[in-house]
């Protein structure tokens, strides 16, 4: 693959990320993860119980993912930080006994804008 090919594919990838929000982005993320990691299991919400803070995980490795992709990420940074903490609490109380949490990833589609200090601070609080 040439450098030009790689740059074209990178541009296509960023274009897709930029265009997707909400469940459409989550489905895109799941498709990538299933191709990259055969053991990845997406979790669908169950009635009023939801997904209990887990949008997908790799059970053998204890690696969990929570996905959040608002339409306007810069307007939702405070909400994202609160969601990150709340969802990790749900994850810890519901999923840790199923597969011990070893790694946690909050997948925030910032649409290339960069992550705010609020989200970084919320992640630091979990450590």
Segments and roles (model prediction):
Residues 79-91:
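Glycine-rich, highly charged phosphate/nucleotide-binding loops
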Residues 64-79:
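Active-site ExK catalytic segment of metal-dependent nucleases
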Residues 60, 69, 108-110:
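Short, flexible loop/turn elements at secondary-structure junctions
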Residues 57-64:
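Active-site beta-strand-loop-beta-strand hairpin of nuclease catalytic cores
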Residues 2-45:
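Acidic-basic catalytic patches of nuclease active cores, encompassing PD-(D/E)XK
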Residues 89-127:
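Acidic metal-coordinating catalytic centers involved in nucleic-acid phosphodiester chemistry
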């Amino acid at each position: 693959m040439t450098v030009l090919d790689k740059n074209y594919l990178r541009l296509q990838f960023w274009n897709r990320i930029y265009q997707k929000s909400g469940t459409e982005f989550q489905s895109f993320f799941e498709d990538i993860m299933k191709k990259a990691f055969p053991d990845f299991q997406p979790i669908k919400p169950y009635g009023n119980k939801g997904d209990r803070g887990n949008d997908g995980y790799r059970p053998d490795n204890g690696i969990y993912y929570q996905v959040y992709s608002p339409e306007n990420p810069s307007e939702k940074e405070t909400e994202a930080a609160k969601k990150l903490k709340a969802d990790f609490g749900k994850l810890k109380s519901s999923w840790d006994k199923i597969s011990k949490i070893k790694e946690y990833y909050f997948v925030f589609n910032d649409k290339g804008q960069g992550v705010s200090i609020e989200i970084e601070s919320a992640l630091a609080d979990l450590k």
